[in-house]
């Protein structure tokens, strides 16, 4: 699993936290950030540079015949697919954690209101 990331020398893809991708001139720059260990101030990161692929395609709209376009490197596309799998999986886990915490807060509120209601009923009974 995650063969493309392992080919880049990333032995533990599960430690990846996030990534950024930007374009500089005719290159795409991929920066991968790893989770921080306790006591570390900065997250470890690695940077990779991919040249953009140049393709000549027919241009029927301008009537010129052909034009050159730059595209993302095919290998980089595969690496990004793997990174998205890892990073989106983390997002789903975070979303689930937030949902559970929200449900817990709501339950606390409902229970507190019910306790107050029961105490009020008890107070009415003791005043009689």
Curated annotation (Swiss-Prot):
Pfam families: DUF3461
Entries under InterPro entries matching the protein: UPF0325
Superkingdom assignment: Bacteria
Family: Belongs to the UPF0325 family.
Protein name (database record): UPF0325 protein PMI2289
């Amino acid at each position: 699993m995650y063969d493309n990331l392992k080919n880049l020398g990333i032995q533990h893809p599960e430690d990846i936290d996030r990534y950024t991708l930007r374009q500089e001139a005719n290159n795409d720059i991929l920066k991968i950030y790893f989770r921080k260990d306790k006591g570390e101030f900065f997250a470890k990161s690695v940077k990779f540079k991919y040249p953009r692929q140049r393709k000549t395609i027919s241009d029927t709209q301008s009537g010129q015949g052909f034009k050159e376009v730059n595209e993302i490197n095919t290998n980089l596309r595969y690496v990004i697919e793997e990174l998205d799998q890892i990073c989106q999986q983390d997002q789903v886990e975070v979303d689930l954690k937030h949902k559970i915490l929200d449900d817990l807060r709501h339950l606390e509120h409902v229970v507190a209101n019910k306790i107050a209601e029961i105490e009020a009923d008890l107070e009415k009974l003791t005043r009689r």
